[in-house]
Regions:
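Substrate-binding cleft of extracellular glycoside hydrolase catalytic domains
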Residues: 2, 10-133, 137-140
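Functionally critical loop-and-helix segments that line ligand-binding/catalytic clefts
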Residues: 2-24, 30-31, 157-233, 238
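Hydrophobic anchor at the start of a short beta-strand
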Residues: 69, 142-144, 166
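Short beta-strand/turn micro-motifs composed of small residues
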Residues: 73, 147, 170
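Glycine-rich, charge-decorated loop segments at or immediately adjacent to ligand/cofactor-binding or catalytic sites
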Residues: 82-85, 151-161
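Short Gly/Pro-enriched loop/turn and capping motifs at secondary-structure junctions
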Residues: 110, 150-153, 171-176, 188-191, ...
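Aromatic-lined carbohydrate-recognition surfaces of secreted/lumenal glycan-active proteins
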Residues: 136-154
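Heptad-repeat coiled-coil/leucine-zipper oligomerization helices
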Residues: 232, 236-239, 243-246, 250-253, ...
Length: 270
């Protein structure tokens, strides 16, 4: 069963969370949770590439902190076939993981299809989104579309995507999108609308959620929750620490290699 038919009218805020990518750097998720945020939406990849920070860095730490989570995938697709292939890579990246929040397609102005311009290729963009989301849904996931308010109003035919929950980006005092949506991304009420969250040293997007996604997903057997409930942490703390140490060692080697290359370049330029 997919997300079709589960889209409901917006209600009161039921949970607050954040969404993250590698731009957020190191995060203390215990502090995030203590500040009242209960879920994290993690950038899992882009185009046909999974990001190492998804399963190798952020997800183990999110689980260790006891936070709910979902994931999103930046789409570079300009054809329906490309969209399906991207979604298949996303599904492969999710593997046997069981997110408690939806998994989202991310359509952006900076993407290839976004660069076509306003009202150019609107139907194709809609078809691309539908193909991506249908692929996720057919794989058993609660699929949703992340996009800005303007994108949903002008760059795709949102009515053709009404069976999928919307995660609306609008950096304002309130969300004024007229359609149904399950989550609103904003920057909070600090000066400049730059989101801040304890445990994160750089700006981060904040999110208000209007649906009890963990309950909906589990009740409908989506995202792998059709079988028995997990008995504990998917990634034990010890394994997480081992993964973190390995990642840090690789990063050190990478930084050293970059420094050596820069030294050689400087030598020959000098």
């Amino acid at each position: 069963m997919g997300s079709s038919g589960l889209v409901a009218a917006m209600a009161d805020v039921v949970a607050r969370g954040i969404d993250i990518s590698s731009h957020q750097g190191e995060i203390d998720f215990a502090k995030v949770r203590a500040a009242g945020y209960s879920y994290v939406i993690i950038k899992a990849g882009q185009g046909l590439r999974e990001f190492q920070t998804f399963r190798g860095k952020y997800l183990p730490a999110v689980l260790a902190a006891g936070l709910d989570w979902g994931a999103y995938w930046w789409s570079d697709a300009v054809t329906v076939d490309e969209a399906r292939r991207e979604a298949e890579v996303f599904v492969a990246a999710l593997g046997k993981l069981r997110p408690t929040y939806p998994v989202y397609m991310d359509q952006e102005y900076a993407s290839p299809c976004g660069q076509w311009g306003l009202n150019q290729g609107k139907q194709t963009r809609t078809d691309i989104a539908a193909a991506f989301l249908q692929t996720l849904e057919q794989a058993g996931y609660y699929a949703g579309l992340y996009a800005s308010k303007d994108w949903l109003e002008h760059w795709v035919n949102a009515d053709k995507l009404k069976n999928y929950d919307k995660w609306v980006a609008q950096y304002a005092a309130k969300c004024t999108y007229g359609g149904a949506y399950g989550m609103w991304q904003h920057h909070g009420d600090v000066p400049g609308f730059v989101g801040r969250c304890p445990g994160i040293s750089v700006p981060v997007d904040l999110n208000d959620c209007y649906r009890d996604y963990p309950a909906i997903i589990k009740a409908n057997g989506l995202n792998g929750w059709g079988a028995q409930e997990p008995s504990g942490e998917m990634v034990p703390r010890g394994e997480y620490e081992s993964m973190k140490a390995e990642r840090d060692a690789l990063q050190t080697k990478y930084d050293g290699l970059v420094a050596d290359i820069q030294a050689v370049i400087s030598k020959y330029r000098g």
